[in-house]
Amino acid sequence: MPHFLAKLDFKPLEYPLIEGDFCFHREFLSLKNPTKSCVYASFKDRIFLLQKIRRANDFLIKSEKATPLKREVLKQALRIYSQSFEVISHNLQENSKHASGKKTLDLGTFEDFIQKNQAPILIEIGFGSGRHLIELAKNNPTKTCLGIEIHTPSIAQALKQIELLDLKNLHILQGDGRLVLESMPNHRCEKIFVHFPVPWNEKKHRRVLSEKFLNEALRVLKPRGFLELRTDDSLYFEDSLKLALKNFQCEIEIKKNAQIPVVSKYEARWNKLKKDIYDLRIYSLEWNETPFDNHAFDFSFDTITISKKSVGTILKTKKIIQEGYFVHVCNIYENKGDFLVELSMGDFDWPVRLFVLLTENQIFYLNKSPLKTLNNHKAHLLLQNILSQKGIG
């Protein structure tokens, strides 16, 4: 992660610090940990935060992951900010020419991406090595291919291949595929691939393929579009088949040990061991007439008035856990009566770290609201109650 170490200097900086498109507006001090602060900054019209941590012999200044910037922009921001310090060490050199310039899609702008996309969509959830996903994009140049993955090394590997092969129709999103599907409009996908997911036979609630996921997939698929599960785990296959048989709006196709053009490293290993591999295709048959409206999920704070005296109580609020979602106030930072609230919240399957800015006149999430899903919206409503001191304790 880009960062720099600086000698301790207890002389406060004079904000704002401005250079080019960068502005470092002010510094918020932690109410929970006096050695931590957040620098509130902007690049053009995008807000971001830097973490500033006072240690025994130095300051550590680095990015705040909840407000990401492109790596080179972040490095430039840190280089500019470091000019106000006596730097001990840093890793802010220019990127190697061999580094990938391709970036993942931002969850915060994913809704706009889907709305603007006019091409048929093919999705692979949990693409691993990326072999199948890359071939999918190469063989379907007029279609939009979307790979969804949570594993960062797999994503980095796929991004390098996308850039190397110049696959302009292939996009990568880091997130939980279950939540991503829930946020998508009806009938936007032709095919959804789930190849060799973790079986989670001892913790079945963690599986990708569940009754809820199947219903969302069939809603998102066009009529005659299909969800394809490929697995070497017989119990996962049998449980998934039972889920499909309970559904009244699908057609099922089953294959065993079918030969396919693209074989992953994982599959090649099982082939050598003569292990059975199961394919389950579930076709969507009906046109879902129920309107999809995630715009009903309002993530604004327009109805809340914050008492500054209540901030201490908010900070002491214990993590609140409900069925499927939670809210945890991790920290609060202050600058002249304005506050930054650091949060972990949302759906248990894919919780998010966010910051909310509280000023006398406005309250809003920095840069992005949570993904528009039902559990995230429930978590937002719970957060409103916490901030307004309703139903706490």
Swiss-Prot record:
Where substrate binds, per the record, is at D232
GO biological process assignments:
RNA (guanine-N7)-methylation; tRNA methylation
Give the EC number: 2.1.1.33
CDD domains documented for this protein = AdoMet_MTases
Listed pathway(s): tRNA modification; N(7)-methylguanine-tRNA biosynthesis
Q: What chemistry does it catalyse, as a reaction equation?
A: guanosine(46) in tRNA + S-adenosyl-L-methionine = N(7)-methylguanosine(46) in tRNA + S-adenosyl-L-homocysteine
Annotated InterPro entries? SAM-dependent_MTases_sf, tRNA_(Gua-N-7)_MeTrfase_Trmb, tRNA_methyltr_TrmB_bact
Q: Which residues bind S-adenosyl-L-methionine?
A: E124, E149, D176
| GO terms under cellular component | tRNA methyltransferase complex
Q: One Pfam family name from the record? A: Methyltransf_4
Does Transferase show up as a keyword for this record?
A: yes
Single GO term (MF) = tRNA (guanine(46)-N7)-methyltransferase activity
Protein keywords: Methyltransferase, S-adenosyl-L-methionine, Transferase, tRNA processing
Q: Does the keyword Phosphoprotein apply?
A: no
The protein's matches in SUPFAM superfamilies, at most eight in alphabetical order, are given as: S-adenosyl-L-methionine-dependent methyltransferases
What is the annotated role of this protein in its UniProt record?
Answer: Catalyzes the formation of N(7)-methylguanine at position 46 (m7G46) in tRNA.
List the PANTHER family: 3-DEOXY-D-MANNO-OCTULOSONIC-ACID TRANSFERASE/TRNA GUANINE-N 7 - -METHYLTRANSFERASE, PENTACOTRIPEPTIDE-REPEAT REGION OF PRORP DOMAIN-CONTAINING PROTEIN
What the entry lists under HAMAP family is as follows: tRNA_methyltr_TrmB (MF_01057)
Protein family according to the UniProt entry: Belongs to the class I-like SAM-binding methyltransferase superfamily. TrmB family.
Q: Please give the name of this protein.
A: tRNA (guanine-N(7)-)-methyltransferase
